[in-house]
């Protein structure tokens, strides 16, 4: 990502929930400052809660170098006092034509981990998209930038909701593929609806990795229903959490999932932070949305949904590799 910023010629749009002032954050800051010095228009959008441990001086340095920095939804006298919704999206768009989205934040945990005895980077996934879909990613950034810099409502508004966009990759450089940029908004449940549709139509497999898996009744029913129909349904979740209380909520769903034929694995490493799914070796989702109430129904999220058999095969291979480093749960703890 820093290399992409380093090669930018016109614009850099960076949207992050977590942006730490550690060695990783400093690398990004240096890359942004260097880009601004070259005359590149640089904008950084961060979430107020996500950066609560980052000193203000870190962002003052960026602003002083010509980088536009905006903080989404700081506390104030409005609905929910600015506690929710949060901007949980992770997005980088360079020159409006190339972008990265996924679950990766800017901090040392994604490089070295945070445990002292057994350091290992957090397991996460992002996807780099080039071509016409880059314009959709730029449009998605503009939506959130406008929400953060104007008086537009920070929650979802029926009159301001935009349709999900899709774009074919350039057939001269890529095999035909369809890329949909799905903007998760409060109350829209778009990724949840997509899972339910895919669960009803899947013929072979549904494999899901979710860092904070606290699904709704309808999501559980969609997955268990697919498993009862003979679809290979697999769920990968962490065994260690940066928020330990989430595990108690996740384990609550194991009994029903296992009883209906859904297979569950727990990642053995420090933290599995990915938010991905692959259906029938063809439909791949990579983004910031976890299957829990915050991710699906409350926060602003961003996911890329890609129809491509080659990418689907790669996603399945990556998933199987992760399972080799995980433990299958065969009984409720």
Please annotate each region the language model reported.
Residues 1-333:
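Charged, low-complexity intrinsically disordered terminal segments
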């Amino acid at each position: 990502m820093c290399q992409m910023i380093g090669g930018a010629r016109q614009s850099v749009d960076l949207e992050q929930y977590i942006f730490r002032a550690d060695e990783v954050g400093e690398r990004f800051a240096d890359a942004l400052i260097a880009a601004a010095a070259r005359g590149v228009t640089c904008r950084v959008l961060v979430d107020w809660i996500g950066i609560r441990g980052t000193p203000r001086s870190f962002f003052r340095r960026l602003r002083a170098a010509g980088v536009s920095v905006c903080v989404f939804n700081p506390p104030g006298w409005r609905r929910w006092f600015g506690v929710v919704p949060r901007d949980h999206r992770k997005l980088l768009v360079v020159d409006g034509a190339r972008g990265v989205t996924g679950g990766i934040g800017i901090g040392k945990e994604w490089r070295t981990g945070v445990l002292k005895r057994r350091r290992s980077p957090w397991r996460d996934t992002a996807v780099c998209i080039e071509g016409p879909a880059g314009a959709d990613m730029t449009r998605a950034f503009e939506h959130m930038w406008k929400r953060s810099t104007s008086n537009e409502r920070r929650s979802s508004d029926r009159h301001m909701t935009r349709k999900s966009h899709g774009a074919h990759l350039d057939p001269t450089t890529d095999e035909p593929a369809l890329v949909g940029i799905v903007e998760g908004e409060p109350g829209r449940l778009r990724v949840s609806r997509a899972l339910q549709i895919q669960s009803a139509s899947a013929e072979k497999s549904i494999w899901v990795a979710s860092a904070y898996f606290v699904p709704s009744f309808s999501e559980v029913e969609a997955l268990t229903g697919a498993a009862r129909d003979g679809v290979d349904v697999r769920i990968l979740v962490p065994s260690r959490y940066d928020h330990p209380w989430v595990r108690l909520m996740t384990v609550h769903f194991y009994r029903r999932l296992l009883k209906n034929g859904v297979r569950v694995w727990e990642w053995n490493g420090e933290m599995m932070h990915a938010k991905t799914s692959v259906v029938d070796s063809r439909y791949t989702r990579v983004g910031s949305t976890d299957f829990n109430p915050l991710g699906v129904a409350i926060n602003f999220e961003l996911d890329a949904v890609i129809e491509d058999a080659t990418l689907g095969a790669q996603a399945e291979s990556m998933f199987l590799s992760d399972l080799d480093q995980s433990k299958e749960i065969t009984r409720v703890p």
